[in-house]
């Protein structure tokens, strides 16, 4: 459930961009967020997710419980079919007004699954009997077996993630003509989008935390990531892992960095072919959305640069230079001056991520390499 809070700042970004949905569908606790979106409870949702902890939404053992107490707790959880989420239910009861939800201009739908036979149930608000919206929202979020199945009118229901974490088909059935999807890559099934509708997909490069973990610090981080992921998906930022400005100066700096990095990489590779492992490190970083910034972003990630801030190409480079191990970067200098030993080249091959950092560091700190034309190379 931790990754749920990311959608709060997706919400904030969409509001800033003056994007107003006519239909919202959601699964699991994403359905809870969707309901609050329909009710325009942004501040309520934000404050809630920034303050609650795991034990505020589910029954957990005491923090200092001994091994015997933990075993007893686990036996009871297994016997009762999952943890008790009465605290979460009380929160839902407090913040969600069913009458207001039904009167809202935004149509709303959720997914849950009948435990018997794992039969999916895609439900619009109109399909849900009066007085049972909170029950079905809790059913959609019943992450069995960790949490108890939700019983409604004698039928037990499970988390909608057993059917579809991202119900695009339901949205189309309800009349959607364009989709903005938030893929949290959560536990469960995420079916491919076969609607054929124009779609903007919002995903995070970063790990968002445990699904059943609530923590204010992690929540704040995920909210910031969600905000920037949304602006990037909408074309207002560039980069893959980091939020980088796409203004003219930042783009000019990115192009200059990419050219200089390519020159340096080519020069080192030709003299020390064993350092090709740095190419592998770059591919494994999976920075596929922005080739010009990919080496800088990969190096920044390895150096531990904060991804929850807004950067220009220049300030991201400065953040990397401040975070990297300068002595370690300097140790690769002979590879760049052509005076390296076989042992130093082998070390670069064995430490591809660190050497990729060194390549970026050298690109940012060394004078520009002269251009070599084909005629000059003969």
Identify the residue ranges that each predicted region occupies:
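Patatin-like phospholipase
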Residues: 1-27, 35-378
């Amino acid at each position: 459930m931790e990754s749920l809070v990311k959608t709060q700042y997706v919400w904030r970004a969409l509001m800033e961009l003056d994007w107003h949905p006519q239909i919202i569908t959601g699964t699991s606790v994403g359905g809870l967020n969707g309901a609050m979106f329909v009710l325009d409870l942004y501040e309520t949702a934000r404050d809630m997710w920034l303050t609650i902890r795991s034990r505020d939404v589910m029954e957990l053992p005491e923090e200092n419980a001994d091994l015997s107490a933990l075993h007893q707790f686990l036996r009871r959880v297994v016997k009762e079919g999952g943890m008790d989420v009465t605290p979460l239910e009380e929160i839902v009861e407090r913040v969600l007004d069913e009458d207001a939800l039904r009167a809202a201009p935004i149509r709303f739908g959720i997914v849950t699954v009948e435990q018997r036979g794992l039969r999916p149930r895609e439900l619009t608000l109109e399909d849900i009997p009066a007085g049972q919206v909170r029950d079905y929202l809790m059913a959609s979020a019943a992450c069995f077996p960790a949490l108890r199945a939700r019983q409604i009118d004698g039928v037990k229901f499970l988390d909608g993630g057993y059917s579809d974490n991202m119900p695009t088909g339901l949205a189309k059935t309800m009349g959607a003509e364009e989709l903005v999807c938030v893929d949290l890559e959560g536990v469960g099934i995420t079916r491919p989008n076969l609607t054929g509708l124009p779609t903007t997909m919002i995903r995070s490069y970063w790990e968002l935390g445990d699904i059943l973990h609530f923590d204010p610090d992690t929540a704040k981080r995920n909210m910031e990531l969600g905000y920037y992921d949304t602006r990037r998906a909408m074309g207002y930022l560039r980069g893959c892992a980091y939020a980088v400005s796409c203004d003219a100066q930042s783009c000019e700096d990115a192009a200059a960095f990419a050219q200089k990095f390519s020159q340096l990489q080519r020069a080192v590779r030709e003299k020390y072919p064993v350092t090709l492992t740095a190419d592998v490190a770059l591919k494994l970083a999976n920075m596929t959305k922005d080739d010009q910034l990919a080496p800088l972003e990969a190096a920044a990630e390895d150096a531990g640069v904060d991804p929850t801030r807004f950067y220009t190409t220049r300030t991201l480079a400065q953040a990397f230079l401040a975070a990297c191990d300068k002595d370690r970067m300097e140790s690769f200098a002979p590879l760049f001056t052509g005076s390296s030993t076989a042992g130093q080249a082998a070390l670069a091959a064995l430490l591809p991520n660190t050497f990729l950092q060194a390549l970026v560091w050298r690109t940012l700190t060394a004078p520009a390499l002269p251009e070599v034309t084909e005629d000059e190379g003969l």
